[in-house]
Amino acid sequence: ENINGQIPELLTTLYGNISMAGKIRLLDVILPKSFVRNFKGPKFGIEGVRRLLDIKDRPIICGMFKPCIGAPPKTLGKLFYEMALGGIDIIKDDELLADPKVSPVDARLEECLKAADKAFRETGRKVLYAINITDSPKAMYEKAIKAKRAGANCLMVNTYTVGFGALADLAEDPEIDIPLMTHPAMAGNFFLSPDYGISSSLILGKFPRLAGSDMIIYPSPYGKVPLVKERAVRISQELRSPFYQLKSTLPG
């Protein structure tokens, strides 16, 4: 009853001052239904994302712009078109590509939506563009609303730099009726130490799902930032297992 349905105070209660008290790790927490019912969670979940893409029985393929830093909107639009023709289902911004002067959010969105429409006319395949709107909470919310009204079909947030509360604000807004993707930048600060921090299954699994992330990117045992296989499996279980009324979150 002391935590009134918000993640910032939940984290403060579970791992606040005690995080500075020595070798202590938060491994897991069982949240009661009375607490979880305060959250709407993911709007779409795995099944909802599959419906948007009209993909029923195959893996969903996600790719990102490379190179991205310094690339103007028209260049990114061209890359988007080529990636869409190549079979990518979700094309995401790099976590470093937020709102630079050379490629602002509005212009980037316009070019990539045109590319998505062109690719759809040629292939009949839908592609989601997870545009990075990371900013201060107020500015990020304004960007989310503006992007949605401009036709955006997916949003990406560097959740561990803006906070779970800011993500939850987006997820719970009825006007922002498009999927939200969490990027893991800075998440390693929480889970990599064997002696301190918060387990990867909580920080990359249970908490972003509670906050309303429809999709989350996280390391795999085979990528450039390898994650122990058992941890990767545990994260996936947290994202997909029954969690009261909450929809699942797509692991990525």
What role is predicted for each listed range?
Residues 83, 147:
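Conserved, mostly hydrophobic/aromatic
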Residues 1-40:
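Phosphate-/polyanion-interacting regions in eukaryotic proteins
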Residues 59-77, 127-139, 187-201, 252:
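Active-site mouth loops of central-metabolism enzymes
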Residues 101-104, 113-117, 128, 135-140, ...:
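Catalytic cores of extracellular degradative/oxidative enzymes
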Residues 88-109, 220-227:
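Glycine-rich, proline-tolerant flexible connector loops at the mouths of alpha/beta enzymes
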Residues 142-144, 150-252:
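Catalytic alpha/beta core domains of metabolic enzymes, predominantly
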Residues 65-67, 95, 131-135, 157-159, ...:
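A cross-domain feature marking catalytic cores of carbohydrate-active enzymes
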Residues 41-71, 117-126, 175-178, 182-191:
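N-terminal small/glycine-rich loop or linker at the start of catalytic domains
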